[in-house]
Amino acid sequence: MSVNDLIKEGVSLFKSNNFDQAIAKFNQALDEIEDKNSQLEEQNNIQSWLGRCYLEQALKVRDITEAKGLFAQAIEHHQEQLKLAKQLTNEQTSIQKQNNAQHWLGRCYLEQALKVRDITEAKGLFAQAIERHQEQLKLAKQLTNEQTSIQKQINAQYWLGRCYSSQGIRIKNSSQAKDSSQNEVNDLFKGANGYFLHSLKLLSQFDDEQERYRIENIICYHLRNIFFLRSKWNLYFDKKKQEIRETLFSNKDKGKVLNKKLEGSISTILAVLNIPPIELGLTPLAHYASSSVCNKLFGVVNEDDSSPMRIGSSSYMNDPSEGEGLLELLSLQDLELENKVDCSSHNAFFACFSSRVNDLNQFRLYGKEDGVEASGCCLVFNKNGDWLKVPDISAPFRSFLKNLDENSAEFKETDISNVEYEKLPLYQVAYIAYKDEYIAEEKCEIWLDNFKFGICLKSVDKNSEWHKYRIKKLKEALQQLIKFFKRKANVNDENKNALEYIRYLFKDFAFRDEEEFRVLKMAEIGSEEIEYCKTTKSIYLPYADISNVVDEVILGTNYEKTHIRYKAEVFQHQMKQKCPNVKISRSSLPIYANPPIKKD
């Protein structure tokens, strides 16, 4: 097999995440080149892919010592790549290959800076990353092909912006940071803002329209985050709302344009309740499950019985009025006086999380096995602020959008199965209260419709200023919705259907203590993405393999007090072998085991 064929096989293995096999294949290709003074471009290519393999492995590893070793190997290969690039005889090819090597060296230092715990060590790594990307920028300017030069300059400017913004966030969130660091943080955010704006300016000169649009969205997302970090709430919120509005409503048929006021209110509510990574910050979230489900999620006890986390149907949630609260607020309840009604073509599916970690009530309700309260598990996400990915705002609604707009090329049926579930956006649930003599006014931040209805929404990540801004925007949008639907002419199927975007983001006030967040997905009944569970006799959507993203599993107080007789040390032992980076702990919340097994 030729060197190039071996490289192709290695690339294929890399793209399928088989990094160890890819490394072996690339090393085999390297061994095929006996004269190391020949085939320099092939050697350069091999070193680049080897570096990327080790970088990907370093990103997936939780143990910092192991990660550092992998980063070191990645850097070694990219340095060799740079050395080989400088030996190439064609000047422009040499510059382009050097540019590529500097890019990946910068990425290695940046990702390592984000991993290490010590802030001083992180600053040193950020400095090296910035140095590499500045070299990348210099090389990009030397390329004679104008479009290639512009593209490479945009890339370098973008990653310089990422280096500055990431360093600012890291210092801001660091427990080692002092009050005097605020000026340093502000300077870093200003620097990031400058690089992102420079890259946008260059982007206007780029000819590839489709690629220009893609890059613009990415840069604008990070620019928007800078607005948030600098407490520029109006700019941040307006950009966030604009993206949602353009994503969900710009592809509709000209003959089916949604009322602008309704469109604006829905976009505002989505912008308030959507919680991207920058807003979630370091807030840990919990998912409670039975011990049997926990075993399946991590593939322990019975490896053949492993399963990804599921997104469950709204039909089987604990709230029988799921999705009805907002309709009642807007006086849009269906009376259902007919002898039969048509079944809905779509349904909402969600995976639920709570900001109440190791919480007694949550353990009693959702963390139980065999009917025994607090015998299940609490899975903790986002302790390090690295759980959420950049969300795809359209992902939850693609099948729904297809149904609303059959002529939209962006949402063809073939696209629906390609949704990356891990990029589904996270939403905070708001709670609707119905005013009575027992609900104090201070229990709700918002009161509507002459104090008939109240809205309860907790602050996220202890950012009181941003929370006040969100409350203001949510109140305005709900008032507009109430006013809109009071006009009988506006009460029609098209306008009511538009509420599908938001009605599952509200729950009854009785569930307020759950402090729920949810990942939401609308799915068409009968579509291939929906799966059936014989055990629970219910339908669901597969969500994601969460074994590499859970930070901690807290075993309930009564974990060992069920008929199944699970043992905590057995679970700990098997998790240490299977998922060594997940912390295992025991809850000591004061609760007796209810039947079938009582207190010893």
Spans of model-derived segments:
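Alpha-helical segment of the N-proximal tetratricopeptide repeat
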Residues: 2-24
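Short coil/turn linking the two alpha-helices of tandem helical-hairpin repeats
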Residues: 37, 56-65, 89, 106, ...
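Flexible helix-coil transition and linker loops at the boundaries of alpha-helical arrays
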Residues: 30-44, 81-99, 136-153, 200-212
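Conserved alpha-helical positions within TPR/SEL1-like repeat arrays
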Residues: 7-15, 42-56, 97-111, 152-169, ...
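Partner-binding and oligomerization surfaces adjacent to conserved cores of proteins
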Residues: 201, 220-600
